Structure formats: C-alpha cells, structure tokens
C-alpha cells in the first residue's frame, strides 16, 4: 500500500506599472512516506496573458504603488493569515540558475503551511479528514495517472527564472514622461435603470383621520383573508373597448393678426437711462462735498506716510474730484421757484384735484350713496353710539328720507324747471334752471350732475334766458337738448367743457316764438315718416305748434301739428258778442303745454293744451285731431303713458286734479285730488305698475293704487317759502328726485 500526501498552494504577485497580473498557479507535490523508495514531484504552473514562463516558486516581495500626489495606492492582500501562523518564506524550487541554497526543510515547511489549501482544493474530493488523517480509497494506479496528467501539463510550458521576472518588473515601472502624458478619458451614457418607487401614505396615530385609516386597513385585511378559498370571489379576465375617435369639422371666427412696432432712437434711450438718475441739486452737491472731504482725508494720510510719488497721486485725485464737482454743478440746473399760477392752471393739477374731490365726496357721503344704491352701509367710527341707538330700527309706515341735495353756489336761487337721466349712464343727471313767469326771467343754465360728485356739477352751460326743458338723446348719449323760455332750441355736447351749443335754432326762420315747455327725443322705427327713420327731436311750444327737428347742416324743423282752439259745443249770444269774436280771432291757436308718444306706436301721441283739453294726434295726419279728452278745467301740465300698461296714461293740471285715462275712453276713469294747489308734475314709478308720484306747489305725494285710490301713501311737505316744481324717479333704486325753486 502506498500513500500519498498532496499539498497545494497559491501565490500572487503584483507588478507596478503593468495592467497584466501574473499568477503563480497550482503546484503539486507528492511524496510517499511508507516504503523503500520515495518520490518527490513539484509542479509549478504560471499563466500569463503575455506568455511568461513557468516558475518553480516565486518569492513574495512587498511592492508599493504611489499615485501622482504621492499617496500609497498599493492593493491590499486578499488572503489574511490566521493568528498564530508562521509567515511563509519564499522558496526557489528547481530553477537552474537559482536552485542553490534550497533545503529540504524549506520545502517541507512550505508544504505544511499550504496543507489546508491543498486539502480544500485538490485532496478535498478524495478524503474526509484534514492533514492526511484519512487514506485515499482509490487505487494507486488511479492516483498515479492523475499525477502524471498534472505533470504533463506543467512540462509543456517553459520555465522562467525569478531574475527575469524581476527584470521585467523593473523595466515596466513608469517614467516621468509617462506620468506627464495627457490621458484622455471618455465618458459615455450608461443604460438607464428604472426603479419602482411607491411612497407609502403614513398617518400619525394622534391625527383626526387615524381611526378612519385603521378601519379601512382592517377592512382591507379582512377582505384579503376572505378571498382565499372563498366561492364568492372568482378571477375573471375582461377586455375594455375604447371608442373609436371621430374627426369633426367646426367653424370659428377668422383669427386676425396684427403687427405693431415701436422705434426708439438713441436719444430716447439716453433720456430714459438718465431720468431715474436725476437728483435734486442739494443732494448732488452734498454728495460732491462728501466725496471731496473723503479725498482730502485720504490725501492727508498719504502725505504723512508716503513719498513724493504718493503726493503726486493725491494731487491728481483731488483734481479729479474738482472736475467731478464742476461737472455736477454744470449738469444740475439752478433751482427755479415754481410759479403758483402755472401750477393752478396746469392740466395735471386740475386732473388730480378732479379725482381727489371725488374720493373725498364719496368718503363723506358713503352711507347715503350706499343707501341710494341699496348697498350695506359702513358704520362711521366717529359717530356717537347714542345717536345710532336712538335711530328707529323698524319703520312701520312708508316715508321719504332726504339723502342729499344737488346744489352749489352757482345754482343757488334758481328754479328747477326740468330733469332728465342719461339713457346710457344712469349716474348722469341733466337739470334745467329757469323761471316760469314772464316778469321773473333772468339768465338760466343747464347743469350735468354726477353721483360721483354730488357737491359740484360736471358741466355747466349758461344760457341767455331761463331753461324750461332738457332731455338726453338715446342714440347719441353725449347730446343734450335744451329748450328755453324765448323759444330757442339748443343742442349741447356734454363731452366737451365748452359753454356754447353745437347747434341752435336762433337762425332758423321757423323757430318757436314762445316758451318751449317740453322737448323729447323720439325713436321712429316703423317707417311711417318715410326718410325720417331713427331718432328725432320733438318740441311743444306756447305758440300752439308741435315741431319736429332734424339735425342736418343745422337745425331744420317742420310742424307735426298746430293746436287749434276747440269750443265748448254751446254757442251763446250776449251783448259782448263783438268782444268774444275779437278774442277768438286773436288766440286762434291753443298754447301747447306737454306731449307724450305712445310706447307701442311712435306714430301716435297725446298733446295737452292750456285750455285743459288733451288731443290725440298722429304724425301722418296734421290737419285735425284723432280724439279729444275733456276732463280738466285748467292747463294740462304733464301727460305720462304707463310703462306697464300701454293703453293707460296719467295727466295733471292746474285744477288740483290728477286723472287716470284709458285710450279708448274719452272721460277719466279715476280722479285723484288731495290738495288745493296746482299739480305741476307727475311720473309713473319704473318698478311698480300701480305707483306714481306727483308734485304740487308745497308737497310731494306718492300714490299706490293697490293700497288706496283716495289718499296717497306718502306725503312730504316742502320747506316754508320753497315751491316744488318737478319730480323724477331714479332708475334701479327706490329713490325719487324732487326739484324746487331754491
């Protein structure tokens, strides 16, 4: 029986400056211990990419590698010896030039150190114990054949000496030139790695939703448990069909593109650049003086410590400061005291005053303006709380509370004759000022008031005589028609602040010769007047004519109707027959006092006369009246069609009465009389079909036919010595405007 002990060891050497790593591979050493003859075999195999020769044994040398900065970057050994083991010695085995000096003790010591590795890599498959404790179960022939195969593989390679390897190591060390070479490193994109990230939704245990989250989590866990082995839940595959897209054609407005350009010259850029840098004279001079003081202090310090060269630099610095000061003084103009008259007359100052005045007025009258517009009132912090608490909280009966008065020093003492709202801007009010009596005539005016400034009118148009009627155009809201006591009809443009009309009838041969008591813009859209479609101006005058005005090169007119006097129907003869005949001949035409067109048919209108009659007329026929409504005993001052019921109208007269008429009935349906004074003006409410307002000489009456047809629901007495003249309801609010003689 022959036993063999095989030992396998492996060593690695690192060569500086070379990318190739040499490996001293497996060597097998077999020796028989029992028997007369012994056999020694040691194979050393070396594998290299460069085709290096085999080595018997290479002594392990510690080689250090340093980088360009002098740092030690030598690789650390992969094998860590167990504590207590003896360091391995370098052996030179069976190499012709280096074979001297090798003893048997060196060989056996190296064999014993690598015995563990040998058992693990080579003998491991053939034994169960370590350090040769077990015998090989294979036959000696199989073992010898395996050893011969290993030896044949090793002898096929050439054997290289250790001195040659050391020489190669020395030759492959980098030189200074190699270290100074520039190495190009190319960076390329690597493949993108997608990592699934599903952030969890965490909820604090002490939050408000913690209980709800716990319940949902528990329900989900129960559902997952119930699904396993439950017949209620089955897996089923489905396919979702998405609808096929459809192409549709649509139309849109043409997209209009416009190109705009602005040219800026060099001087514009220069001025714009310097404008924020312009400073007042005092600030610039202070900066120049401060700079000069700093320069003088620096110059004094430099003279005490530096040479003549430094003095020269200080002199140049001070001279440059002087140049800067002269430049600042030349660039900054002399301060000129502004002229107060120029400031007061400047447009910018007037515009600033205009806006500032509006802001102050709106802040002062905020509560009243809010009540007018039916908005919540902001409490004044400076107002006494006792006064607020003393105000009644609930008002049982309806009443009128005064908000403010459109009055100023210019309008003080003038009689309000007419009022009209602008058709487009409901905040703009036109008021005419003039006297009604012939002996009381004086200069009149027409003013345009705005709710944004109730203390002063926006426009003031002075007239030679008193203004008796005003009205805004609906088609052209900037045109204001004004009728005067001397029969003149004028048209003003409220967009301009000029105090003269753009058109008037003073040069027209067919102008009115008596006071124009009413005028109104009428829209004719039914084509009954031929070429005169659109908006026309109609006026009624005390000379007995109802006239239509056209705006062409000037104001041209033609008569719609001449109001003729009508008898009472009874002819009585008396001794004064000649006197009555003469009177009838002189006053053949009845003075016109008012008119109003039918809302549903602009070709039909009513005209009130000084006789007390109301005539129904047509624009297509001017020879005679269509109908005559008799009921008043005095001059008819106002006629108003109902905005809700087109066949009903109201009329007021100097006979203290207000009549309610129906178009098909020639006698009044209702008569309202609650005063002993003449009723000057009436108007329907724009918000209620049964409510209207009336103004007599000393009181304002608000009637509600749904409450009472005998007495008005609201009565407000005028101040002593003040006569009320006109009434006008405000639009979109529960307010009414009253004109008086003050």
Swiss-Prot record:
Assigned GO CC terms: axonemal dynein complex; dynein axonemal particle; motile cilium
WD repeat locations: 462-502, 511-559, 631-671, 674-713
GO molecular function: dynein heavy chain binding; dynein light chain binding
Pfam families cross-referenced by the UniProt entry: WD40 (PF00400)
Subcellular location: Cytoplasm, Cytoskeleton, Flagellum axoneme; Cytoplasm, Cytoskeleton, Cilium axoneme; Dynein axonemal particle
PROSITE patterns hit by this protein: WD_REPEATS_2, WD_REPEATS_REGION
Domain of life of the native organism: Eukaryota
Alphabetized InterPro entries for the sequence: Dynein_IC, WD40/YVTN_repeat-like_dom_sf, WD40_repeat_dom_sf, WD40_rpt
Keyword Ligase: no
Keywords (A to Z) from UniProt: Cell projection, Cilium, Cytoplasm, Cytoskeleton, Flagellum, Repeat, WD repeat
BP GO annotations: cilium movement
Role according to the record: Plays a critical role in the assembly of axonemal dynein complex, thereby playing a role in ciliary motility.
Oligomer status and interactors: Part of the multisubunit axonemal dynein complex formed at least of two heavy chains and a number of intermediate and light chains. Associated with axonemal dynein subunits such as, DNAH2, DNAI3, and DYNLT1.
Protein name: Dynein axonemal intermediate chain 4
Species annotation: Xenopus laevis (African clawed frog)
Encoding gene, per UniProt annotation: dnai4
